[in-house]
């Protein structure tokens, strides 16, 4: 059991090292895309399933409340938090539409969809991205594996941050770290002199 614990830590560290080499440009581009959208008075819609939903909620909470420093609230909505809306849509329109219907209702040109999917193949996330495209929104996608169907939907203005791993647990860990990096970059760009 102790050896298995060491393996988990070692794999996580190795994935972080690989990501630190492969992802800084994509993370920086995503952060600047998010910052520019916020400066233009737009909002960020976030979605994911399971652990990805938790990461989406963490991002939205860090925008609305704060990340590490006190600052004005920033407009972000986690689409996976309203159980009444989610179950109403799932019951009437099938599960695949739980985020797409919200994107069509709440999203506007210039807004961002932060779509988080470990494999990039979750039907409800893919449908949300398709809906965002029809609303002239920009997509920031956090994926893993080969990027899945989601990667094929992205245009030149969109940003994919694909974790270099084929292990779901490692991808999810790196998604959380990536969300934290994005929050840090947004805060330090918009509010460079804020104190803790």
Curated annotation (Swiss-Prot):
Coiled coil: none annotated. The keyword Acetylation does not apply. Signal peptide: none annotated. GO terms for biological process: carbohydrate derivative metabolic process; DNA replication. Pfam families: SIS_2. CDD domains: SIS_GmhA. The keyword rRNA-binding does not apply. It comes from the Bacteria. Belongs to the SIS family. DiaA subfamily. Homotetramer; dimer of dimers. Required for the timely initiation of chromosomal replication via direct interactions with the DnaA initiator protein. This is DnaA initiator-associating protein DiaA. It comes from Enterobacter sp. (strain 638).
């Amino acid at each position: 059991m102790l050896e298995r614990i060491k393996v988990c830590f070692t794999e996580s560290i190795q994935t972080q090292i690989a990501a630190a080499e492969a992802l800084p440009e994509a993370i920086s581009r995503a952060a600047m895309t998010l910052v520019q959208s916020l400066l233009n008075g737009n909002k960020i819609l976030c979605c994911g399933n399971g652990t990805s939903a938790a990461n989406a909620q963490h991002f939205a909470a860090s925008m609305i409340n704060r990340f590490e420093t006190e600052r004005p609230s920033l407009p972000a909505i986690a689409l996976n938090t309203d159980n009444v809306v989610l179950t109403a849509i799932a019951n009437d329109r099938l599960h695949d539409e739980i985020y797409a219907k919200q994107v069509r209702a709440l999203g506007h040109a210039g807004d961002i969809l932060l779509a988080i999917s470990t494999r990039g193949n979750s039907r409800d996330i893919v449908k949300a991205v398709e809906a965002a495209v029809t609303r002239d929104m920009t997509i920031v996608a956090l994926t893993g594996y080969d990027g899945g169907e989601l990667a094929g939907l992205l245009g030149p203005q969109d940003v994919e941050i694909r974790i270099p791993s084929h292990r779901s647990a490692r991808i999810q860990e790196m998604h959380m770290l990536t969300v934290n990096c994005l929050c840090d970059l947004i805060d330090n760009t918009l509010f460079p002199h804020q104190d803790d």
